[in-house]
Design a protein with these regions (language model features):
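Amphipathic alpha-helical interface segments used for oligomerization, scaffolding
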Residues: 1-202
C-alpha cells in the first residue's frame, strides 16, 4: 500500500523528490478527513498542480483547507477530489487564493448544490469575469478596473461578486446581462446575499 501510494504521489505530483513526505501528508489528511489516501492524493494533486506548487508545504495547506471544508460544508474528500479540477485552473490563473476557493466550497455545498455543482457555478462566475459580456465589461471599467481578473485580485472573490450583484440591482437589469449562465447567477446571488456572512466567517 505504501509503495503504491508513493507511485501515485510521484505520478500525481510529477517527481520523486520528497514523495515520502507528500505521501505522509496525504495519509494524515485522509485520516483526518475520513477518506482514503487515494482520495487525498487526488484532491491535493489537483489543487497544488493547478496552483503550480506541489511542495510538501502546499500539500499540507490544501489538506488542511480540505479538512476544514469537509467539517464546515456538506461535502467529502472524494467529492472535492472529483470537483476541484473543474475550477482550479481558472481560479489560479485569475489570482483567486486557495482560501477563497475552499471557503466557497465550505459555504455553498448543501446550499446551492453538491461539490461538483458548486465548482461549476464558481467556474461560471469566473468565466463571466474573464470573458465578460458587453455589460460586464462596462461595469468593470466603470468601477476603475482594467479587467475582471484585476477586479478579483484587488477586491477578492466575494467583493467582486457583491459589486456586480449590487450594480445589477441598481441598474434594474437582470443579473443575466452580467453573468450569462444560470449556474454563475445562482452562486453569485447566494454569496452576495444570504450566504455573505457565512462565507466571510469561513474565510
Amino acid at each position: 500500500r505504501w509503495a503504491g501510494g508513493l507511485d501515485q504521489v510521484v505520478s500525481a505530483c510529477g517527481g520523486s523528490h520528497g514523495a515520502a513526505k507528500l505521501l505522509e501528508n496525504n495519509a494524515n489528511g485522509a485520516s483526518a478527513g475520513r477518506a482514503t489516501t487515494t482520495d487525498a492524493i487526488n484532491l491535493t494533486s489537483a489543487v497544488t498542480r493547478g496552483y503550480g506548487d506541489t511542495s510538501a508545504t502546499a500539500v499540507q495547506k490544501v489538506s488542511d483547507l480540505a479538512f476544514v471544508t469537509v467539517q464546515l460544508g456538506q461535502t467529502t474528500f472524494p467529492e472535492l477530489a472529483n470537483s476541484m479540477g473543474l475550477v482550479v485552473p481558472l481560479a489560479s490563473s485569475m489570482g483567486v487564493e486557495m482560501e477563497q476557493l475552499f471557503a466557497v466550497m465550505a459555504t455553498a455545498t448543501g446550499v446551492t448544490g453538491g461539490a461538483s455543482e458548486v465548482a461549476t457555478q464558481l467556474r461560471g462566475v469566473l468565466q463571466s469575469l474573464l470573458a465578460p459580456t458587453g455589460e460586464m465589461t462596462e461595469l468593470i471599467k466603470s468601477l476603475g478596473f482594467e479587467s475582471g481578473t484585476a477586479m478579483v485580485q484587488q477586491l477578492g472573490l466575494q467583493g467582486t461578486i457583491q459589486q456586480v450583484v449590487a450594480a445589477a440591482e441598481a441598474s434594474g437589469a437582470p443579473l443575466q446581462k452580467y453573468m450569462g449562465s444560470i449556474e454563475a447567477q445562482t452562486l453569485a446571488l447566494a454569496l452576495a446575499g444570504p450566504q455573505a456572512d457565512s462565507y466571510a466567517q469561513k474565510l
